Amino acid sequence: SEMCIRDRNMTIQEAQKIIDNWIKEKGVRYFNELTNTTILMEEVGELARIVSRKYGEQSFKEGEKDLDLADEIADVMWVLICIANQTGVDLTEALKKNIDKKNSRDSRRHLDNKKLR
């Protein structure tokens, strides 16, 4: 199933299951929640470095030009999914609820924000 996943779309639920299986088969076990949260911050930092170099005012250092934005985003997602898995969060349901919340609570917030005009 690892090879065929590249040939089709993948749901969030499938990603959670694939990562859970990988952790159990190849990763021995999940790191604890605190360790994974720290790893998440590290991965977000790596993503931030690329964004600041590519879109911000900083320039790339020697050897950084081949850094891959998509791969760093995927690293963030991987660790986030690990945290969701180990804490029993169904990300599909959580995201649906979050979108509903934004649609009800924040539906006019940005449209009415004069700073964005």
Q: Which residues fall in each region the model found?
A:
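Flexible "arm" and connector segments at domain edges
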Residues: 9-73, 77-117
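Short, small-residue-biased leader/transition segments that mark boundaries at the very start
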Residues: 1-5
